[in-house]
């Protein structure tokens, strides 16, 4: 944020923290969901960021900068832009592709939503959680 102020960047917006329920409205105005993490190997397979699932549910293509299961899923489902970590060039290229091909972006968003519904159905996941919690309580 300080860098944006220092360099007078007016094309970057920082929002205050918001409630989870307000995210859908904020994401409705977005073109791409960006999941950017530090290049830490433990993140490749050991994270499951909520924002990834929020973007899928909102029908947003996902741009992610680290390898691992999420990048593989994005590539396999063609619902976004998996880019290598620590590659500003790949990041810029992905943003240019997103801006230059709105039809492709829309298709990716549709596939993101389909992925959310097919692989991560809320009701089924909630039922699985209830089953686990009931097992723990009974143990």
Outline where the language-model segments fall.
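Amphipathic alpha-helical segment in the mid-to-C-terminal domain
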Residues: 20, 88, 105, 118-126
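Structural loop-to-beta junction motif characteristic of Rossmann-like glycosyltransferase folds
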Residues: 31-32, 52, 59-62, 79
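A short, well-ordered alpha-helix in the C-terminal region of glycosyltransferases
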Residues: 90, 97, 104-118
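C-terminal alpha-helical cap of glycosyltransferases
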Residues: 122-139
